[in-house]
Amino acid sequence: MGVIATPPPSVQGPSSQVPSSAPIPPGPVQDAYLQAVQQEMQDKGYLVARFDALMDWARTGSLWPMTFGLACCAVEMIHAYMARYDLDRFGVIPRPSPRQSDVMIVAGTVCNKMAPALRKVYDQMAEPRWVISMGSCANGGGYYHYSYSVVRGVDRIVPVDIYVPGCPPTAEALVYGVLQLQKKIKNGNRLIRT
């Protein structure tokens, strides 16, 4: 895993050409950067960092989702929290209240009658908040796309950050979606493909 930061002025070389949000690749430049940071910690006893970068780093390890299980995708979402996949190890702990949550996982078919309740729960969540759309039904209506009573994608109600495809998607797919959301948060709400 690369270090993401702006190298201190004491570190010269190719690192000065690295943008502040780009990871510093492992090697002598990263080693020099880490030594400079350790020296600064020993000299001053504290480290100066950008607050928003520090908050984004902290948020990646403490995502508290509001689970909104509406259909068969909810069973796979439950599997992701069990011992085999264990989303808790990534700091993802489900919360019973939207006021305590910062992520909403919408798993399943959203009907027109459920849409106002979904929006109300989303509005009750504190900022910053993210949405994971799980499964074909939540992504675009799925099997029931042409039904008069089905919303053709949860993104018509709330803004979606991560789409997890599948019918139903596996627990591994949800874990991957959560990891992608953590990467997006860490990179300042923009997903950089690697």
Swiss-Prot record:
Pfam families: Oxidored_q6. GO terms for molecular function: 4 iron, 4 sulfur cluster binding; iron ion binding; NADH dehydrogenase (ubiquinone) activity; NADH:ubiquinone reductase (non-electrogenic) activity; quinone binding. Binds 1 [4Fe-4S] cluster. GO terms for cellular component: plasma membrane; respiratory chain complex I. Keywords: 4Fe-4S, Cell inner membrane, Cell membrane, Iron, Iron-sulfur, Membrane, Metal-binding, NAD, Quinone, Translocase, Transport, Ubiquinone. Its EC number is 7.1.1.-. Residues 1-24 are annotated as: Disordered. It catalyses: a quinone + NADH + 5 H(+)(in) = a quinol + NAD(+) + 4 H(+)(out). NDH-1 is composed of 14 different subunits. Subunits NuoB, C, D, E, F, and G constitute the peripheral sector of the complex. Belongs to the complex I 20 kDa subunit family. HAMAP family: NDH1_NuoB. This is NADH-quinone oxidoreductase subunit B. It comes from Rhodospirillum centenum (strain ATCC 51521 / SW). The lineage of its organism: Bacteria, Pseudomonadati, Pseudomonadota, Alphaproteobacteria, Rhodospirillales. The gene is nuoB.
